[in-house]
């Protein structure tokens, strides 16, 4: 691969502990194969709040709120080698982590 290329990896998950473990696994794999790694950089957490009525009929003043937090991390693999790309493609990560890879 050329020297100007970099791989940008964005990770998303609802559980921040699983997300951090996955990010650490990616960084460790990339460093072991000889690539320079920048990150993991924590991105802002999205918080989606849903408000519903507690009662099925009336009592509008009684409501309940639920929230769903989406945690995100960004990892840049600078100067990736073909060995690095192959190792990252074969990496097994948990099911709760969404991965976006841009070359």
Swiss-Prot record:
Gene Ontology cellular component annotations, sorted alphabetically: ribonucleoprotein complex; ribosome
Taxonomic superkingdom: Bacteria
SMART domains for the chain: Ribosomal_S10
GO process terms (BP): translation
The keyword Membrane is assigned to this record: no
Keywords (A to Z) from UniProt: Ribonucleoprotein, Ribosomal protein
Cited NCBIfam families: PRK00596.1, rpsJ_bact
Function (record text): Involved in the binding of tRNA to the ribosomes.
Name of this chain's protein: Small ribosomal subunit protein uS10
Organism: Ruminiclostridium cellulolyticum (strain ATCC 35319 / DSM 5812 / JCM 6584 / H10)
Taxonomic lineage: Bacteria, Bacillati, Bacillota, Clostridia, Eubacteriales
């Amino acid at each position: 691969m050329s020297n100007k290329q970099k791989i940008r990896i964005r990770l998303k998950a609802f559980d921040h502990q699983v997300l951090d473990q996955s990010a650490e696994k990616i960084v460790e794999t990339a460093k072991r194969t000889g690539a320079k790694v920048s990150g993991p950089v924590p991105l802002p957490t999205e918080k989606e709040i849903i408000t519903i009525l507690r009662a099925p009929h009336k009592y509008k003043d009684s409501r309940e709120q639920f929230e769903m937090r989406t945690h995100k991390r960004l990892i840049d693999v600078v100067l990736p080698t073909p060995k690095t790309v192959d190792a990252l493609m074969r990496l097994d990560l948990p099911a709760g982590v969404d991965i976006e890879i841009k070359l």
